[in-house]
């Protein structure tokens, strides 16, 4: 049985990280179901144009929510350090300050995307025939930004104190509800892409509001008292350092992907549809190592706060080996079953779309160990209060990816050049991150 709450400062290292990571993995699995359900229903029942529109919308939404996710992850890292060092009062103060800060940013972000939607679609070079579909989908899906903030904020708070089970439970209910509502809204009510978007937004509010109310009732140690509701400049500076830098790292990562999406869109509907389906499979495939990296980050943060550097070093060795094993297995599975996986989302008769997606998956899939290492590096530098290093690694990875994608796609390689740019970017960032770590040790 997986315990509800972990102290990662004692006990078996690998076992504890894995036990903490498992609910994160299941939770991310369910999170992926939101978009996979949309992709499957839209791709199978509404056609390639609708799939291309929803796929491009997903890339945009991932960028926007990454800003909030980074802020929530950063505030969670601050809380985790204070939890590890036993600073309960300061921890509650961090909850008060970070909640108001991120809630305000979420409201501003929501307003900006509504006002600038037409300009955003133009920048993404969305084909004219898809603009109406994308606009219909996005105008509804943007309503879920507040729900995304609520869920990610409270989920990261609970994970900071070692509880990864409760976020999983709320996400499970929400994901199942989303699948049911997707089928009802698209197949029964015939609401098209608007129905798929509405199903997702409603389900997001179920998980966001639900986990917020549950946390406030069941975890009093995280609920600010009246005396905690004040602005402490030093504590706020620490929260801002971790939150803003983590948000910058997350948003740079997804802005780079957004730029690549714009390039992909220029190749037409076939490549857009292939990319939309393949990215879902790709994200799903490396999800275990991403969540393992987040679990490792909490492990490092708690031990960093508790002043246990030797235990951190042992955890690095253990996490590196475990992540490598994950990646090898996942790489073999994706490369072997790329075509059947594409067939989940695309009608087998659309062979051109499937062929493009298979090529993408086999190039990326063969190199998953690169992103596995990168997720560990992101988690480590965030946990030891060096989020700026995570930003540098992200710029190296995504900068390389975007630059090479535009350069190589203009050669006879064409769209293959876009696919090849990804693992090259991972490798460069890994080399920088490992080199910096080794230099600091000497």
Regions found by a protein language model. Give the residues of each.
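Short runs within selected transmembrane alpha-helices of multi-pass transporters and secretion channels
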Residues: 72, 141-159, 167-175, 196-211, ...
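Small-residue hotspots at the loop-to-helix junctions and early N-terminal turns
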Residues: 48-59, 138, 197, 269-284, ...
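N-terminal transmembrane alpha-helices
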Residues: 8-45, 59-74, 78, 103-110, ...
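Small-residue-rich hydrophobic transmembrane alpha-helices
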Residues: 51-111, 148-167, 274-338, 371-393
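Transmembrane helical elements of multi-pass membrane transporters/channels
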Residues: 19-38, 140, 151, 174, ...
